[in-house]
Amino acid sequence: MKAAIIGLGVEGKKASASFLQHDWQVYATDLNNKVDLSDFEIPLVEIDLIQDDDNISMITGSLTVDLGFFNSDEIDSSDVVAISPSMWGSAIAQKYLEEGKLLCDVLTAHKDIFTIGITGTNGKTTTVHMLKEILEESGKKVLVGGNAGGGFEGYYDLILKANSEDYDILLVEVCDMTLEFCDYFFNFDLLALTNIGNDHMDVHKTIANYKNKLMNFFKGKEIVLAHNQDFQSDFRGVASKSIPYYEFQGDLKIWGNVNKLNAGLATAIATYLKIPKNIIKDVLSNFEPVQGRLNVYKLNDSLIYIGKTDNVDATLSILNEKNFYATFIGTPRANEYHRLEIIDEIAKYHPEVVVLFSGLDDTIDMAVERFKELQYDGRIEIANTLDDIIFLLAEFSHEEAIFIGGNGQNTIIEIQERLKLLSDNCNNSY
């Protein structure tokens, strides 16, 4: 079969890779002629390349890529058209929906699997992994995935896998920017909300708009909400059933009140699915932090709290629990001004030292300027490399606590990996 991929952002690239892995012919296109194709990992000797000033065409094996233009004949001759979730609601998405060419309308086995969606601003990935481990320990075969930008292989990969093997449960992490897309592509039996926070405001514009999108998503479905969730009456009013969850009361290896809530949500869903209490308790008490998410390492006299906190609410959830001598913050993309609110809160918190490193983009100058505008008078350091970060951590490692967060999941994972080596070598694992 043949798939046409329109748009080569993170989701489009991963969709292309997934289709190829399932032995499909793939036509991939993007109007941006500067898309980085290195993610496809194709040896240059195997590529037929045609290039002019504005357009690039590449053919290799089962893959054809056009950049700067698209070939209508290639798209129309495809069995399936895969659009970026960000294109949902556009005229082109509507066209292929009406033609029945969207993947979820061609391959439909995934719609027969009991499907759980986890959405919200923070805590989705940790909750998904907690629940996955509980379900697998109880003997269920679980397929897990979600938004490609969140570290998974993408929504299309989920559908392809669900149509090639048998599973008991489909567990989907749903990005708050893809609610309408996922509502059409998946048949959710249960939806859960971790929380509502101030993120992706460049898309939602206001919390009220985000709330309204969630109400549409929850309409007619069974939902799981925190017992004190904002807008609870609105959500309950549109849902067919609402189940509350509370903080987990047992012991956890992972730190923080936010993780007690994540564990509480996983517990509520597992209880709904009639998983025995002893399995839930045993799995959660031994649950290890997800890569890139909040973890704690000991280095000399200091405890280092590190994890992606790419919005102001995630950052505050950490700052409100501990007194940190230094905070290391990864910077956002140049156009993500709403994420600079993280800096506003760091300035109010006023640690002795702020260390800035490039997270998603080299926007350190923008961050420094924001600190100056806020009249932060502590010490500001710039870390241009991983070695710079480790050097500064060593300098501060006799203080009680250090926080590393902000934007840039891949960079934060690299720091975690280096910290673990240092911590293990010092025989000081937390």
Segments and roles (model prediction):
Residues F19-L20, Y184-N198, W255-P289:
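A conserved, hydrophobic alpha-helical segment in the catalytic core
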